[in-house]
């Protein structure tokens, strides 16, 4: 379990460093195209970090990871079912999964500050809730 906690902590450190790079929500409408693309990349990476942590825990618990075309969404459902995260965390993190999917399949030209604003605004709260859920699960 110590090795798992070290791996999770490394993911947290990466996420923490990303969050420090995010501009305030109010500044988003004034960002240049490449800056908006950078913000979108940070949001995408945040979700990837969350997913990495969930996969680490499921593997440690010997729970098979979902497969198939909807495995990302199924991973969140499985994490909730196994008590790793709460329903509200699954729903909130799911917003970042939806954005990750959009970002991965859209042209950067289709990025708009209005779409990023709620994700930037809520990121710290969602991340805090996620960390609390993970801590509660690991401490059981």
Residue ranges and their predicted role:
Residues 1-140:
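Solvent-exposed interaction patches of small proteins and small membrane subunits
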């Amino acid at each position: 379990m110590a090795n798992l906690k070290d791996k999770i902590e490394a993911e947290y450190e990466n996420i923490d460093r990303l969050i420090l790079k995010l501009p305030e929500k109010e500044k988003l409408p004034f960002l240049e195209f490449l800056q908006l693309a950078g913000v979108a990349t940070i949001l995408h990476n945040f979700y990837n970090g969350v997913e990495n942590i969930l996969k680490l825990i499921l593997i440690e618990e010997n729970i098979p990871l979902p497969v198939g075309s909807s495995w990302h969404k199924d991973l969140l459902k499985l994490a909730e079912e196994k008590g790793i995260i709460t329903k509200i965390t699954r729903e909130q993190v799911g917003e970042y999964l939806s954005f990750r999917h959009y970002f991965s399949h859209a042209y950067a030209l289709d990025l708009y500050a209005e779409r990023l604003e709620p994700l930037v605004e809520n990121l710290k709260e969602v991340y805090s809730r996620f960390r609390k859920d993970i801590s509660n699960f690991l401490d059981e």
